[in-house]
């Protein structure tokens, strides 16, 4: 399973630049562990991510917080200026089947064309335990 992850509004409550909520990260960890899922960044944060050398301070903070929960970032989508195209291209490049991914995002407007397995998180709460329960019922 692959989780395509937006950050702002999913791992925080849109409370300012580059803020991360431990509760939201714990909920993501629970979801990833139950589904044996890898994380692929779709967030604009991904532009600061690199496998070689040091990433941006925000990504380093994210990697540290994820690591504390036993999670790592497997990859990131390319910058094609269209979230649907970026995710679709990653799915094609990595031969991911329709039943083997979830898209977590808080912004429906990023998805101008229909895409399967999209789950919209309330950006006032970030990812909650109830979201995790709903997703586990749907994808387990």
What are these regions (language model features)?
Residues 1-3, 100-101:
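The start of beta-strands in P-loop NTPase/AAA+ ATPase cores
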Residues 2-81:
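Alpha-helical substrate-recognition element adjacent to the catalytic core
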């Amino acid at each position: 399973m692959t989780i395509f992850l937006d950050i702002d509004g999913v791992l925080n409550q849109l409370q300012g630049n580059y803020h991360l909520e431990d509760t939201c990260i714990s909920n993501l960890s629970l979801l990833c562990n139950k589904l044996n899922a890898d994380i692929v960044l779709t967030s604009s944060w991904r532009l600061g991510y690199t496998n070689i050398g040091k990433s941006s301070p925000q990504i380093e903070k994210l990697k540290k917080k994820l690591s504390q929960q036993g999670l790592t970032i497997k990859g990131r989508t390319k910058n094609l200026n269209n979230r649907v195209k970026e995710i679709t291209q990653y799915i094609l490049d990595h031969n991911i089947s329709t039943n083997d991914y979830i898209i977590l995002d808080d912004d429906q407007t990023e998805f101008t064309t229909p895409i399967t397995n999209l789950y919209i998180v309330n950006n006032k709460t970030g990812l909650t335990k109830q979201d995790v329960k709903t997703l586990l019922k749907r994808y387990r």
